[in-house]
């Protein structure tokens, strides 16, 4: 299925940070997808990103990005997701958006309404729950091999500067 001949979907990337860096290699595993263009308001960072990943087009603005892609992957700062997703949908592009998707139910409903009216896809990039290791873990849990589950503790740790903008729920949704 992954190797069937299909028209290539050209993907445009909004945001060129570490999350986007992890995304770029993935379409190479599917013969019908290619990253064709990237955009970052910081053009210097965008040029560097495109050179590193051999992305042919550095978009100067969103209009140029939309002209050169079929779908958009959003990996920009969290507080920009809503505006970028709305802009892409209104430009007729399907959207894959990193988490957190948006900051309110109202924003989510509005974006899904636009996508539905325009018959576009709007997807949250929630990959972990669908990776093979997670599926295997759940099958082990359901099989009883591990025994009765009485408690689950999970954590993600990282050293974050207490003044980091990522802790500001207004702009990043907060990581706490």
Which functions belong to the PLM regions below?
Residues 33, 70, 93, 120-121, ...:
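Short, well-ordered coil/turn segments that N-cap beta-strands
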Residues 109-127, 148-152:
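Rossmann-fold dehydrogenase core element
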Residues 15, 99, 144:
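Conserved G/P- and acidic residue-centered "switch" motifs that form tight phosphate/ATP-binding loops
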Residues 33-37, 72, 173-174:
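Short active-site oxyanion
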Residues 1-53:
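N-terminal Rossmann-like dinucleotide-binding module
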Residues 37-39, 59, 73, 150-153:
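Residues embedded in well-ordered beta-strands within globular domains across many folds
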Residues 128-176:
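Predominantly a Rossmann-like dinucleotide-binding segment in NAD(P)-dependent oxidoreductases
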Residues 53-112:
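Beta-loop-alpha module in the N-terminal Rossmann-like domain of NAD(P)-dependent dehydrogenases
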């Amino acid at each position: 299925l992954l190797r069937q001949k299909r028209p290539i979907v050209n993907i445009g990337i909004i945001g060129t940070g570490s999350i986007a860096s992890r995304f770029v290699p993935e379409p190479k595993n599917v013969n019908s997808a290619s990253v064709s263009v990237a955009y970052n308001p910081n053009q210097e960072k965008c040029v560097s990103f495109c050179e590193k990943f051999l992305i042919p087009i550095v978009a100067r603005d969103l209009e140029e990005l939309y002209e050169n892609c079929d779908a958009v992957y959003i990996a920009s700062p969290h507080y920009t997701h809503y505006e970028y997703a709305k802009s892409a949908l209104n430009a007729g592009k399907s959207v894959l958006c990193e988490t957190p998707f948006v900051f309110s139910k109202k924003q989510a409903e509005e974006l899904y309404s636009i996508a539905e009216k325009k018959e576009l896809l709007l997807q949250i990039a929630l990959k972990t729950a669908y990776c093979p290791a997670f599926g295997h873990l759940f099958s082990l849990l359901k099989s009883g091999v591990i025994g009765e589950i009485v408690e689950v503790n999970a954590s993600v740790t990282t050293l974050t500067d207490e003044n980091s903008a990522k802790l500001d729920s207004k702009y990043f949704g907060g990581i706490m």
